[in-house]
Amino acid sequence: MTKMMTPAMCQYYEAKQAYPDTLIFFRMGDFYESFGEDAKTIAKELEITLTARGKDKSGERMPLAGIPYHAIDTYLPRLINKGYKVAICEQLEDPKKAKGIVKRGVVRVVTPGTAIDSSMFSDASNNYLMAVAGREIGKPGKNAENEFEIGVSFLDISTGEFLTTQFRDSENFEKLLSELARMRPSECILPSSLYENPALAERLRAQTIVQEFAPDISGAKEAGERLKNHFRVATLEGMGCENLDFAVYSAWAALEYAQTTQMRELTHINTLRTYSNSEFMILDSVTLRNLEIVKNVRDEGDENSLYRILNHTKTPMGSRALKKWLLKPLLSVEKINYRLDAVEELTAKPLLRYDLRNWLSDVRDIERLVGRVVYGNSNARDLVALKKSLEALPPVRDSLLENIESTILNDIAVGLASFSELENLAEMIDRAIVDEPPISVREGGMIKSGYNAELDELKDIASNSRQWIANFQQKERERSGIKSLKVGYNKIFGYYIEVTNANSSQVPEDYIRKQTMANAERFFTPELKEKESLILTANEKAIALEYEIFTEILQTLSAHSRELQETAERIGTLDVLTDLAEVAENNNYIRPQLTDDCKILIRDGRHPVVENTVHGGFVPNDTEMDCKENQFLLVTGPNMAGKSTYMRQTALIAIMAQVGSFVPASYASIGIIDQVFTRIGAFDDLASGQSTFMVEMVELANILNNASPRSLVLLDEIGRGTSTYDGYSIAKAVVEFLHNRGKVGVRALFATHYHQLTALEEKLKRVKNYHVAVKEEGHELVFLRKIVPGATDRSYGIQVARLAGVPEKVIERANEILKELERENVLEEVEDSKNGKKRKSKATARYTQMMLFDPGDSGGNTAKVNRPSPVETVLKKLNVDEMTPIEALNKLHELKRLLN
């Protein structure tokens, strides 16, 4: 370090050298300051003033940016949410007591996935750190794609939740990316082998912050040993991951990264849960977006999402649990029915449900409160919130024990009853902490009187000091006879007795001179000196003792962290169940039936979101699908008629059913669905340089490669992003492929404007045609929103254009062009599946592009164009009966000229 740098700047550079890729918040008195390039970054991102102070290593003026220490909760989240890592370098000793330069050191590193402060994330969402481990596994065969064995872990240090799984994935990492979409981590850490894999790292970066991190271990075996040491267990078998090497490795990577950034052991992370993808319906990022499960497409908020419709939970734990349920619908009919039994019971018992929801409304975020307690960054207000939450639980427990029958509700009641210390912990906090404590835990004022005798005495000394001084002053006036005598205080000389020079002859002999002034003398007595020592140290001692008592309370609560976290989980589950019952009753939902066959039967189904937003009532529709005759539903009809809404509502009803929710229908029976695939909507992926059509084909490829007979596929307007012939050919091939896949086919809803596809109903036995009914009233088009059997051969495009507000001149011209095309009798040949012969029908969907192609080169779907000659056109318009001989002769000359 250069001699021109101050000792404090030397400390700053030492911290920066230790954390080169991290912004440094360096505590200087009442400010956190940053220097050099960090200062420039912070000033820009936080929009604060950039100044300069001192010299850098080269002797130049050092850029400086700073924020008040008490405003860190305002500014820090803004940097973290932009993906920065921030190292907090604190003063490690009291500057007043420091000998020389104040000791400073980094006490924690805040990253997007390891934030603990509630200001940095939403109560309704988990803040996951994702860790990935894996290895490429070659497959035999010249053209075989390689696979990867992948382990993934998710850790939320704010709640203590810790999950891991392991699976085999393709070289495109579809399963891993689906997990990413479902869990939505704030940060992902990768070992170098995966970090340097462009196929993975770039796709991860598109959705989260990605860091390279390798834990300080030799391999999975050592990772397992360290996990066992952390959890204080002899084996990981009870956690389900004993032989899952990559899951174990990723789990330790997540925990080591979290403990390294927080610079402490995270004892509130006290269990690891292993889960399998085979337990849950798969909803990939495309499906989550298209169906707007937890956020909408418009602004990625939750308005008009399924989550928003269903989320009337009373607690943060309930909000988070509901989101997890929606992102991971169950595949087990038995487990789904456990949830449905509870929802049904709570629906049938409205008074019980009302009481439970009323009590739950007093429960705060127990999970995160406990996390902060164990972590050590909680304050007295957190303890008051925890106390109020615990006080609300005994009536919940007792009411459940007395009134419930269903399995899940009984498990919750028994679990709450097993927490024997619940009331004692609430009582301890109530006896110790004042009702409205200050935020700071180092300034006193948070412990109630009567909790600790020593503290009461110190507080009494401190609070009664003014009265004692007043009494002492009055006593000395009477003893000395000096009416103007006064007792004062300043920081330099402490307490003193002041006597003016005019009264100096009356000063008692036991007064000891302390200070001489121009017009007065200041004295003290042994009694005043002794009291001064008590007064000045009492407040300091009281504050220190309060903090000590507070710390003891935290330790007591920490000893029960596991029971508190389990209680929080039970309350979250109860909150979701009461919420689903409330929503079911308010929205007229019914209990669905779940089966292990492939049938889907929905009567009077409604879109759960749209029915809450439309005016004038929602038109319900039926859906009937099976594996024999109605496996592939081909839906035709005009734009805006409701095809997409119908398809989406079918999928949403199925998802709700497998979540364990009642559904918007009069009857519903759902054959378990393992994955919902969607190809709906059109947009360009500009970030990846992909056009609308390319995006469509990538999503379609994923569906065709991965859909199983247990899946549900929604396809909307496949092929519209390219030429008509290409689009039609692709659409037809897709229908045939899905219908014939694995000889049993795939359940699918396919909306299209290629009306020629409706002929496939006669060729493919499990394809069935449906269309959206419309009614024409003059030039007006009335959408009936009803899905009815059979096909339609009209798109009503011009009528829809009129409804959209297209200028009337354009509408009129479009009608003229349409009539002209119809007069020209543009025909196409399509294959009649009944007899294999060609039949002719009007090509209403492809007029504009058909002439771009050679009719004889259309891959079997030839288009024959019969254009009338100019002479034929004139002849058709003639009315021979009304023509005179002269007029007939003139017309004949005109026809001859046309022929020439």
Curated annotation (Swiss-Prot):
Residues annotated as binding ATP: G637, P638, N639, M640, A641, G642, K643, S644
Domain of life: Archaea
UniProtKB keywords: ATP-binding, DNA damage, DNA repair, DNA-binding, Nucleotide-binding
GO molecular function: ATP binding; ATP-dependent DNA damage sensor activity; damaged DNA binding; mismatched DNA binding
Record-linked PROSITE patterns: DNA_MISMATCH_REPAIR_2
Family under the similarity heading: Belongs to the DNA mismatch repair MutS family.
Biological role stated in the UniProt entry: This protein is involved in the repair of mismatches in DNA. It is possible that it carries out the mismatch recognition step. This protein has a weak ATPase activity.
Name the record gives this protein: DNA mismatch repair protein MutS
Species of origin: Methanosarcina barkeri (strain Fusaro / DSM 804)
Upper lineage: Archaea, Methanobacteriati, Methanobacteriota, Stenosarchaea group, Methanomicrobia
This protein's encoding gene: mutS
